[in-house]
Amino acid sequence: MVVSNDECFRSGRPDHNWAAAPLVLQRRCLLRHLVGLVGLGSLAAPAAADRLPPLCGSAPPPAYPAADKPALVQSWLQDGRQDGPLPDCGGLRARDFELLVRITASYIAPGDLDTQLSHFGAVSHLKGASYWSYSDRKRLVLFHEAYAVDQPGTLKPRADFSAAELRSGNELYFVHSDNRSSTLSPYSLRLVQSSADAFQVLIENVTDLRYLGMTLVAHHEMQWAVAIERLGAGRWGYRSLLGLRHLHLGRAEQHRLSNLARSVAMFDLLAGRQTDIEGYR
C-alpha cells in the first residue's frame, strides 16, 4: 500500500475523523511522519538500484596501517560514494550488495591467536560498547544487551563461546539489542577459515531486523566478515567487510554512515580505542 502525503494530510485535518481512518493508513502515516523527523527519507531504495552493476570486484585489500595510525575506513554505495576500486567480496556468501563497508587496521594486543579468537566468542562484552553517532554528533552506547544463546529461537542466556567452540566450525548464535531498538535480535557466528597465523569469522542476521513493523534488513541480508592475521609479536592485522544486500528503509547515505560507525565501533572494542570518525563523512 502506497500512502500519499495528501492522504495523510486529509486524515490529520481537524474536520477529519482520524480514529475512523483504516488502521493501516494510520500506521503508514505515522511511519511517514517519524521517518521525516529522523531524516531517513524515502521508505525504500530506488528501483533503479536493481539495474546498477554489483559492488563486488577483484581489487586486492590495502596494506595494514601501522598500529599507531588510524584505521583505513572505506565504503561503497551502489548508487553513491565509492572509496576506490570495487573490493573482493570473497569473505561474504553473496555478491549482490547495495552497500559495503571495509575497515583495515592493525593493533597491539597480548596473547596468541586463540586469545584473539576468543574475543569474538565473548559476545557479552558487546554490552555497553559505544560508537560515534553521526546524527547525534556524540558518542552513545551502541549495545544495551548482548549474550550468547544455544539456538536463535531462544532468549535464554548461556556462557560466552570459547575459542574451542568456535574452532568446531559449528554455527553459533547470540542476541543483542541496540540503542535504536529494544528488541533482542539473533545473529549467527561461525569460524569460516583458520590457519596457524590467521582466522576469519562470518556474522549474519538470522531473522528480519524491523522498525515500526517495517523491514530494515531481511534475514541473512547483513553479512559481516572479519579476518585477523598475526603480523608479529603482539601485533595483529584486522580486516572487516560488512555487506548489506538491500537497503529497505531510508536514504542510502544514512545507511552508509550508520553502518560505517558501527563497523568502526566493533574494531574499537577489540583494539581498545575510540576512533574519531567524523572526518569519514
What residue spans do the PLM features occupy?
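Hydrophobic/aromatic beta-strand elements that line small-molecule binding cavities or substrate pockets
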Residues: 186-193, 223-229
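Short, highly charged C-terminal tails/helix-capping segments
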Residues: 275-281
